[in-house]
Amino acid sequence: MELCQPTSLSDHDQPASGPQRGVMGLVGPDAPRGWSEEPEEHAQLQRWPEGPNAPICWPEEVEEPHAPSRWAKEPNAPRCSSQEPDESCHLAEELEESDSPRCWPQEPDTPCHLAKELEEPDAPRCLPQEPDTPCYLAKELEEPNIPRCWPQEPDVPCHLAKELEEPDAPRCWPQEPDAFCHLLKEVEEPDALRCWLQGPDAPCHLAKELEDLDSPRCWPQEPDESCHLAKELEEPDAPCHLAKELEEPDAPRCWPQEPDVPCLLAKKWEESDAPCLLTEELEEPDALHCWPQESEAPCLLAKELEEPDASHSCPQEADTGCLSAKEPEEPDVSHLWQGVPDAPCLLVKEPEEADALHCCWPEESEEPDALNPPCFWANEPDEPDPSRCWSEEPQVLCLWPEEQNTKRCWQEEPDAPCFWPEDREEPIVSCLQFKEPEKPKVRSSWPEELEDCCPTRGLPLEPLLADGELLQACPGPPSDPGPALSLPSEPGTAQEEGARLRAVFDALDRDGDGFVRIEDFIQFATVYGAEQVKDLTQYLDPSGLGVISFEDFYQGIVAIRNGDPDGQLYSVEPVQDEETPACADEFDDFVTYEANEVTDSAYMGSESTYSECETFTDEDTSTLVHPELQPEGDVDSAGGSGVPSECLDTMEEPDHGALLLLPGRSRPHSQAVVMVIGSEEHFEDYGEGNEAELSPETLCDGDGEDPAFLTPSPAKRLSSRKVARYLHQSGTLTMEALEDPPPEPVECPEEDIADKVIFLERRVSELEKDSAAAGEQHGRLRQENLQLVHRANALEEQLKEQEFRAQEKVLEETRKQKELLCKMEREKSIEIENLQARLQQLDEENSELRSCTPCLKANIERLEEEKQKMLDEIEELTQRLSEEQENKRKMGDRLSHERHQFQRDKEATQELIEDLRKQLEHLQLLRLEVEQRRGRSSSLGLQEYNSRARESELEQEVRRLKQDNRNLKEQNDELNGQIITLSIQGAKSLFSTSFSESLAAEISSVSRDELMEAIQKQEEINFRLQDYIDRIIVAILETNPSILEVK
């Protein structure tokens, strides 16, 4: 699932535009909000990416540096709500942008980040309910007055968890991947809560807080994810009121599961100086902070000042609660971090009773020995000392070992990865999980065999041993009688230890040839800050071959662990009624464990921050001091967080997993937490902070005793982001660890003094060896210096010889250049003489041409006169031709007129003849009738009539044909005459165009080549004329040869 990463003005110069920028004005009838028109010291406009999941948050204009925020004047209006339906709202981005505002998302498809609480102390942390009442959603490090809470809407249904059929089963995480978790349903009104999941399939992730510092921190709202915060209620329509804030100001603020469940988010809102802490209680240290599961148990997320003995939790059972935070011991402390800037954030406190604590998030595993889930958070209700696992990210595993017989919880499906996913692009790697064959009753929080369970890289955790052999990395819950997660002083078998070291060696062996080059090891140790590289190489490569074999590597690690040359082990005197802490064994085993941890993570081709040896060695700082004497400057305030001097931590942050160990104050039953922190790509140091050195005394802690501390080494520093990352991800430190007085230093036993003496003897021998080596090196350098002096003298002699040769060569080159110059001058003089002779010749030719010029001019004048005469003749002939053409035109017009007249006469004659013929026929018919009357034969008369009619018709036809023949002859004669006339005119035009120009003018204006071309054109024209005349004659001979007859 991808989470939208917010960006701020620290990354961009201009604020977002369009729908992503907050617009001043009222959004709803009850929603006045304090918008910031210009950037203030503690309020800036924030810019988010343009994607569909981009968050929207409006900054607050803060006039005073420590003012919580200028919210709306009406107490019932929610503040800092997102207005875009497709935008995600970050409640608090507190790691990267110190001044960015915090709010809740409105879009079901966008992630909402609960709180980024370490880097940005000045940004508001949620939606305050009253202008002067700060409400703390999470624990802040530097600014206790920052408001944190959720606005309450009386009509918003909130399904935090689904109540199960069995009353004793934990009520938190769903066992079905499709279970719906609706922490809050968004409504159209601007006063509706903008935080919880909207979609039916949306997973609910509590908070991804510290590992990926740049990723959003809240409840992602994308569907189809496998990890849900809680199962949907059996009655999805049952309303869950966070708080009826608009109607009842004193209504409890929480997430009840049923209408009769009293769930209080904050007890008092009216008192301006009483902040509502979501994760802490001020009055009663034993109060529970958890989430509600049943109606019989009251759920008080933060009940302040009025009911100190009330259980502040959302209970799972009447006697089961999840501690969201540990409360300070002083009741007047208003904030967890107020006045304690250097204290780590203790996210979870467990009650003193062994059976009182049940984590709010997990769900009981139906099979106690089920090993499929890679992590778990809480124990079973039936088991007194179950283990807890808090998996926050694909590469973050927080193990809460609380008993040897560890059970697994939070099992959704056999293959469902139980972690809070984060926006990461890294490949999925398998969890390395180891099984301890020696302790069959001890169950680790990891499966028994290596399996690709989830995209996390787990660490091989050793089985838990006795209470005296604990490695207290971080104080566990005080009430859990289970022992802390410990590393055994000796591996189970030599084969297992060899397997772990083999994994480390294979990670360092880049070439795969079975050897690790000493240069690669030194480079690795130098890059990761190891200060005793020489001592390490002496142990790992005693023969000085330049390569490290696995046998040397194994023996060196065993020697470092057994002899402990670099750790500078010191023992502490046990306090009264306590046993002496078994320090050396646990510390030695921790070296082995560290090597195995580095195998899984640090050497997998990624950049790491600290080497495996840097954590345990420091040549300069090895004195046991009081924790109070530790300088206060050894904390980093760049991200608004700090580490108290009592907490000396060491942290490995490789690519896929790391070990974070923080010793805290002890408990009757000491607990330890090993934080496996991944995502090395998000490591970025903001500012310089001093780190604390991890000593064996720090790593070992007896049953119910406080550890001893060392002065922090300035060479080994944990950045504020590492500290911040621990503060939110450990989730196990308690406020009592900060409020209790620092542990008193104890005296070291005689055995530790003997170890110190042995160590000092070793150091003296090493220094003697170094001195001898320095003397040898000095003599060698003197010898080399003498050789270099001799060589310098020889080079000086050689230089002098080279200079002499260079001078001779320069003289020779100068002589050659002079000879070449003389030769070039002679050649140039000869060329000048030749050019002068050529110039004289050209002058003579020019004089000759000038003498011919008058003759040529006379010829030109003569030719021009001839040309003029020819032009006059041509003009005269042209005039005559025009006159003839005019006469011809007139005659043609007259002829056409006469022809037209003749045609009309002819037609009139034809009509007259036709009339006469008709009259004749009529008369003949009358004659025949008369003859019939006279008695003549009709047949003879009819024949005679027919013969005469036929004769008359033939005569008319003959006359018509004769007339047509005469017309055709006349037309032929006319056409022939026209052809001849046109031929003559064409010939004249050709001759006139050919002789239109004077020959002298043409000769004077054209060159020889052009003249020859003109002659060729003239010959071509003559040829064409001859051909044209021949064709005319042939046409005349064919049509009318009589025209050519001589009369």
From Swiss-Prot:
Keyword terms of this UniProt record: Calcium, Cell cycle, Cell division, Coiled coil, Cytoplasm, Cytoskeleton, Endosome, Golgi apparatus, Membrane, Metal-binding, Phosphoprotein, Repeat, Transport
Pfam families: EF-hand_7, Rab11-FIP3, RBD-FIP
Residue sites binding Ca(2+) 2 per the record: 541, 543, 552
One of the record's GO cellular component terms: postsynaptic recycling endosome membrane
CDD domains cross-referenced by the UniProt entry: EFh
Modified residues (Phosphoserine): 641, 765, 829, 938-939
InterPro entries, per the entry: EF-hand-dom_pair, EF_hand_dom, FIP-RBD_C_sf, Rab-bd_FIP-RBD, Rab11-interacting_regulator
Membrane topology, from the record: Peripheral membrane protein
Chain ranges of the FIP-RBD domain: 985-1047
GO molecular function: calcium ion binding; dynein light intermediate chain binding; identical protein binding; molecular adaptor activity; protein homodimerization activity; protein-containing complex binding; protein-macromolecule adaptor activity; small GTPase binding
Positions with a binding annotation for Ca(2+) 1: 509, 511, 513, 520
Protein origin, superkingdom: Eukaryota
Compositional bias ranges of the Basic and acidic residues kind: 64-73
Coiled-coil boundaries: 750-985
An example Gene Ontology biological process: protein localization to cleavage furrow
Region feature ARF-binding domain (ABD), mapped onto this chain: 775-879
Subcellular localization: Recycling endosome membrane; Cytoplasm, Cytoskeleton, Microtubule organizing center, Centrosome; Cleavage furrow; Midbody
Region called Disordered, residue ranges: 1-107, 311-335, 475-496, 882-906
Recorded domain comment: The RBD-FIP domain mediates the interaction with Rab11 (RAB11A or RAB11B).
PANTHER family in UniProt: RAB11 FAMILY-INTERACTING PROTEIN 3, RAB11-FAMILY INTERACTING PROTEIN
Function per UniProt: Downstream effector molecule for Rab11 GTPase which is involved in endocytic trafficking, cytokinesis and intracellular ciliogenesis by participating in membrane delivery. Recruited by Rab11 to endosomes where it links Rab11 to dynein motor complex. The functional Rab11-RAB11FIP3-dynein complex regulates the movement of peripheral sorting endosomes (SE) along microtubule tracks toward the microtubule organizing center/centrosome, generating the endocytic recycling compartment (ERC) during interphase of cell cycle.
Assembly, per entry: Homodimer. Interacts with RAB11A; the interaction is direct and is required for the recruitment to endosomes. Interacts with RAB11B. Forms a ternary complex with RAB11A and dynein intermediate chain DYNC1LI1; RAB11FIP3 links RAB11A to dynein and the interaction regulates endocytic trafficking. Interacts with dynein intermediate chain and dynactin (DCTN1); the interaction activates dynein processivity. Interacts with ARF6 and EXOC7; the interaction serves for recruitment and tethering of recycling endosomes-derived vesicles to the cleavage furrow/midbody.
Protein name: Rab11 family-interacting protein 3
Species annotation: Mus musculus (Mouse)
Lineage: Eukaryota, Metazoa, Chordata, Craniata, Vertebrata
